[in-house]
């Protein structure tokens, strides 16, 4: 019988003491047991896409446009829109297009939590305790991307939130959060060779990779830097328990959206 003890070591298998085999098997276990979404993931993807389209100022959407944006079927889009409508988040226009209403702080938190639950989470630790800082690893990622590596990976979390909202009241990022849009995880060791995938939810992760179902179109490229969407960043902050900071950020987003709608500069 193969087990993993409290220290994260393999026990009860003749090859468990082999470093390479042990590392491979632990990676497999961590990947397969990481946080995953529930069965309604496609509907939530539609809802998240609608929110992100609104944040990017793309205006009212047809069902067909939503289908194309998130790659979902018509019944899935219809079900998601129906649920969002019942929650009071959507306004239906006379031409059958739909638009997202103003979202309260409570609505933002509800949507972002559901979005976060719709992702697979892979956590990486540094057994040496000498990992690079999150900011240094983010810069390393940007350099790798300039060389064609990890093109569908973007920086989220605290660093990403500060990109969209520089007034975020956090001194330093506790970890590097990355949104993975269909990319593998081999690139992580290029950020810091000592990083190892863990299945222990209590372990202090220095890098957290969120495998998202959000369309890559929402990745923001800015002066050689690659940032996850606003909604991804907000979901990351909630995952870290930074609710007050989330409220500050969504207040800023709502303020900007209101001024943009009125044609004014915030």
Model regions: which residues?
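Short amphipathic alpha-helical interaction segments
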Residues: 71-86
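A short, conserved structural fragment
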Residues: 85-96
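Short, cationic-aromatic polyanion-contact patches
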Residues: 39-43, 95-116
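Internal, well-ordered alpha-helical segments in soluble enzyme and binding-protein domains
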Residues: 42-46, 62, 76-80
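Short acidic, hydrophobic short linear motifs in intrinsically disordered regions
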Residues: 56-70
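Long, low-complexity, charge-rich intrinsically disordered regions
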Residues: 1-27, 114-266
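Short alpha-helical segments that sit at the start of domains
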Residues: 19-49
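Short helix-to-turn junction characteristic of helix-turn-helix DNA-binding domains
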Residues: 50-54
């Amino acid at each position: 019988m193969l087990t993993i003890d409290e220290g994260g070591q393999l026990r009860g298998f003749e090859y468990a003491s082999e470093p390479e085999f042990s590392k491979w098997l632990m990676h497999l276990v961590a990947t397969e047991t990481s946080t995953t979404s529930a069965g309604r993931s496609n509907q939530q993807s539609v809802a998240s896409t609608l929110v992100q389209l609104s944040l990017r100022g793309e205006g009212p959407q047809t069902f067909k446009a939503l289908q194309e944006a998130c790659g979902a079927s018509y019944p899935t889009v219809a079900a998601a829109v129906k649920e969002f409508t019942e929650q009071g988040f959507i306004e239906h226009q006379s031409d059958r297009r739909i638009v997202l209403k103003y979202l309260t702080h409570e609505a933002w938190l509800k949507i972002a939590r559901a979005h976060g639950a719709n992702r697979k989470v892979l956590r990486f630790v540094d057994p040496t305790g000498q990992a690079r800082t999150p900011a240094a690893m983010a810069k390393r990622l940007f350099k790798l991307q300039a060389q064609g590596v990890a093109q569908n990976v973007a920086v989220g979390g605290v660093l990403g939130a500060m990109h969209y909202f520089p007034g975020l009241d956090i001194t330093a990022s506790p970890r590097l959060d990355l949104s993975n849009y269909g990319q593998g995880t081999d690139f992580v060791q290029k950020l810091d060779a000592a990083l190892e995938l863990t299945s222990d939810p209590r372990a202090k992760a220095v890098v957290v990779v969120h495998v998202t179902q959000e369309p890559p179109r929402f990745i923001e490229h800015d002066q050689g830097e690659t940032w996850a969407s606003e909604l991804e960043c907000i979901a990351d902050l909630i995952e870290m328990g930074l609710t007050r900071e989330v409220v500050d950020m969504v207040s800023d987003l709502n303020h900007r959206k209101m001024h943009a709608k009125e044609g004014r500069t915030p």
